Each structure stands twice: as C-alpha cells, then as structure tokens.
Amino acid sequence: MVVQNVQDLDVLPKHSSDSFDDDGRPKRTGTVWTASAHIITAVIGSGVLSLAWAVAQIGWIGGPVAMLLFSFVTFYTSTLLCSCYRSGDSVTGKRNYTYMDAIHSNLGGIKVKVCGVVQYVNLFGTAIGYTIASAISLVAIQRTSCQQMNGPNDPCHVNGNVYMIAFGIVQIIFSQIPDFDQLWWLSIVAAVMSFAYSAIGLGLGVSKVVENKEIKGSLTGVTVGTVTLSGTVTSSQKIWRTFQSLGNIAFAYSYSMILIEIQDTVKSPPAEVNTMRKATFVSVAVTTVFYMLCGCVGYAAFGDNAPGNLLAHGGFRNPYWLLDIANLAIVIHLVGAYQVYCQPLFAFVEKEASRRFPESEFVTKEIKIQLFPGKPFNLNLFRLVWRTFFVMTTTLISMLMPFFNDVVGLLGAIGFWPLTVYFPVEMYIAQKNVPRWGTKWVCLQVLSVTCLFVSVAAAAGSVIGIVSDLKVYKPFQSEF
C-alpha cells in the first residue's frame, strides 16, 4: 500500500467555492509569477545601488562570497517560513495572514510582541530609506541637466528636500489603495523598472571597465591609508566599513518580513507552500545574479572609489539621457516598493483600530466614491488620516537624516537576524517538532547564532557611520 504525504497533494481546501476561499475571504488569484514580482519588487530595490561600495570594502574575495552566503541563508530560511503560512497541515490548516500571525500560532508569548516591534520598525525604516533613495535619484536627474548647461566640472549641489516632499505626496495617494492584493499591477511595473535600472547600471559598468582597460580593485578591498571620495581610510574606518558593508548586503536581501503577506495573495491549488517555494527560488536566483553582476562590475569599474549610490553619486557622467532614464526607473520602482513594504504595517494598525473601536464609524465605515466608470472606490476616513500621517512622518525623518548608506546598513542589520533567520528557524522547529540537540536542531542553531554575530557587527558599523555624519550635518539642508 502506497501512502502519499498530504503535503504533496495539490488539493483544494475544504469549504472553498468559486468566489471564496476556505477562510471565507474573496478568492485569491496570485501565482508563482505574481508572487515572484512582489518579491523582486521588494528585494531588487535601492539596496542594489550600494553593492559596488559594499564589495569595495571587502574586496574580490569577501564581496562575492558574502553575497552568495546571504542569498543561500535568505533562500533557506524563506523556505522554512513558507511552511508556517498554515498552522498544522500545510494544505488545509488554519491560515496565518501576517508574519505576526505566524509567530503567534507557532511560538506565542513575548516573542509575538518582540517580532511585531522589530518587523514594523524595520518596515518603517525601509520607508525612510526608500524616500531618501528616491530623492537622491531625482536630484541626480536635475544635476545632469545642470551639468549639461554649466559643464561637467560644476558640482551643481541640489537640495533634496523638495523631492522628498514630492515623493511623499505621491505615496499619500498610492497609500489609499486598501489591500495588498490590489497592488499586483504596481508590483509588476516596479519589478520591470528594477530590472531596467539594474541593467543600465550593469551596462555602464561594463563600458567603464572597457574604457579603463583594466579591472580595478583588490582581493581584500579598501586598504588603510587609501584616499577615497570621503577621505583617507583609517584602520578603525576599515573595520567599521567592513561591518557596514555586510549590513548593506543583508538589506539587499531583505524581504522575509513581508513573505507571509505575499503568500496570502497566492491561490490554491496548488498548495500555497509549493507556489511560494518556487517563487522564492526564482526570485532569489534572479536577484543574486543581478547583485553579483552589479556589485562586481561596479567595483571593477571604480575600485576603491566605488560610490555609495552607483547611479546617482557621480560614478557615471555619460550618457546623460541614459542616466536620467535609469534614475527615473529607480524612482518608479521605489514608489511601488514603498507600498509593498508599508501595506503590512498599514493593515496591522487598521486591524487593531477596528478591534479596539468596532462601533466607531470613523474607523470602520467605508464610503463608496464613484471616481471612474465601474467599481466604486472605498474611502475610509481612518485609513485616509492614518496613512497620510505615516507618509508625512517618514518624509520628515528622511529630511532630518538623509544618510543613504548608513541607513541602509542599519536597516539590514536590524532586520536580518531576527526576521530572516531567528523567527523562521524557531517557528520551523516548533511546527515540525525538531528534537532538541538533534543534528538538525544543532545545525539550525549554529546558523542562527552565526547570523546574530554578523547582524551585531553590521549594526555597530552603521551606527558609527551615522554618528560621524551627524557631526557635520545640518537638519533640513540635505544637499546631494
């Protein structure tokens, strides 16, 4: 008699229908490709722009090895996390709609609150990082126009505050989209844009290497005493920059905190866990190839002077029109990525508000507005006020602290170990009843502890960088 594991059966869960899923919610429509688009939109973001700088800090050996290791860890722990979307049976078990729901079902207790704080602080910080990155790209577009008129030697300093405000206004509008599932089209557009500017950066890097007639860089990266764009590198700076570069690479692979929310958009059959494993493999494989190419080619082109933002910090100067297209693509991508990251935070706050104030019309009432022919738009006053306040806050903080590389490194360090490694590992151990002190348990714990040390080191390097920047920075005078 052949016994087949129920996890391998692509069956439709009970109590589902043509219009609704087994949990009574509207039928989910996500596929491998839409899930991959969501992930790629989240992963290939502004982090790719700092990879050449990160590789420059640790060299031709450390750079590629670090990217490969981070990609492996991210893929492996993401497959563990995929298994936690449903509690119990992976096909018919109770759904966990958010990352925190999965923590609550599998771990419970104080870990739920700790996870919530880390996850939502990281999402909040990512919104700040994306606002800064968008302003840098818009400033770069204005700078190329200025240098076309005044010559390439004109520094053309531009205040980025107006662009941060403009980006914030756009986000206020898009943030009124009620649900994550309705963002599929924005994610696809953003994913296409991410490929576009990554490809342009890669092409410009290759052309720069050909122009130089040499491959720059060294096996161990920037050496003590080297004069870079930001000054002479001291021994302590070498250490802190090495740690910060690990944070930048970790941030480039950061998406675990929204993986469960993405999985909740996927239809079944086939089982959601199978779809997400495929989507995770496709996404991580594609992004790793892009990261290796962009980071290594950028380092080969500029060596120790690789800029913090490959397309906007003066690394390339020609052709102007292509640089403008690349930076515009970055901005369009960041509009979508901002929403992909913030929707889980929006949903959490609105769910809590509805639970605490179920009788309040301000919180719960949906006002139907017919903007265009067809389906009316649902306007919720609490959603309007809260999401607008959130965007305004992230914009204000971005104007106060526009340190792209340091912020990116700190975000990567804060989020990588707890969200990408620790909680997925602990949930998997709890759900699968992995025996304590068994071989698998020990291997998982070694992985977790190793990543903890990496995160602490990366956070320290980024904090030192922010402190150094604050010594010379004047608030609301963000010139790039």
From Swiss-Prot:
GO terms for molecular function: amino acid transmembrane transporter activity; basic amino acid transmembrane transporter activity; symporter activity. Keywords: Amino-acid transport, Cell membrane, Membrane, Symport, Transmembrane, Transmembrane helix, Transport. It is found in: Cell membrane. One of its GO terms (biological process) is basic amino acid transport. This is Amino acid permease 5. Disruption phenotype: No visible phenotype, but decreased uptake of L-arginine and L-lysine. The keyword Transmembrane helix applies. It is a multi-pass membrane protein. Residues 11-25 have a biased composition (Basic and acidic residues). Residues 142-157, 204-241, 302-328, 405-406, 467-480 are extracellular. Residues 1-25 are annotated as: Disordered. Pfam families: Aa_trans (PF01490). The chain crosses the membrane at residues 32-52, 53-73, 121-141, 158-178, 183-203, 242-262, 281-301, 329-349, 384-404, 407-427, 446-466. Basic amino acids are transported in their fully ionized form. One of its GO terms (cellular component) is plasma membrane. Expressed in leaves, stems, roots, siliques and flowers. Amino acid-proton symporter. Stereospecific transporter with a broad specificity for glutamate and both neutral and basic amino acids. Reduced affinities for asparagine and valine. High affinity transport of the cationic amino acids arginine and lysine, but not of histidine. Inhibited by 2,4-dinitrophenol. Belongs to the amino acid/polyamine transporter 2 family. Amino acid/auxin permease (AAAP) (TC 2.A.18.2) subfamily. Residues 1-31, 74-120, 179-182, 263-280, 350-383, 428-445 are cytoplasmic.
